[in-house]
Design a protein with these regions (language model features):
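Catalytic phosphate/metal-binding cores of nucleic-acid and nucleotide-processing enzymes, i.e., regions
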Residues: 1-135
Length: 135
């Protein structure tokens, strides 16, 4: 391959726009809001790192440690009068749950937890504030 061919391929590759990780931005905003509004519960809301791409070896290692597909993105380990915990699945507008996520939702709810799909910071604020009113 000549220098010019390599250079043209590099230019084509670098001219592609990077995908905007909108879901990541929404989740970061939600966590920031929660930690500012509820500092006494800051360590009770945590992320479940299921979405990262992994090698087959690392994926097997994580499954052995208990990682499950379909688990919600955020979990609030605080019960209220009606539920044991709040599980929040983040989705950017226009995206929907995968079948494995719907299966996990059913199991989660069957075991006394609240599960919600959130597509914006405003939705998250409503859900969390309403959930924590019922303590």
């Amino acid at each position: 391959m000549t220098y010019e061919e390599i250079k043209s391929k590099a230019c084509v590759a670098s001219s592609r726009s990077k995908p905007k990780n909108e879901e990541h931005k929404i989740q970061c905003s939600c966590v920031r809001y929660f930690r500012l509004k509820y500092p006494h519960l800051r360590n009770m809301l945590f992320a479940v790192p299921n979405a990262a791409r992994r090698s087959a070896r690392n994926g097997a290692y994580m499954k052995d440690e208990g990682m499950l597909p379909g688990v919600a993105d955020l979990i609030l380990l605080k019960s209220n009068r009606f539920y044991g915990a709040l599980c929040v699945e983040m989705k950017k507008p226009g995206e929907y749950q995968r079948p494995v996520q719907k299966d996990w939702q059913k199991e989660c709810e069957a075991n006394g937890n609240k599960y919600v799909v959130v597509r914006s910071l405003d939705e998250f604020i409503k859900v969390v504030d309403n959930y924590l009113k019922e303590i």
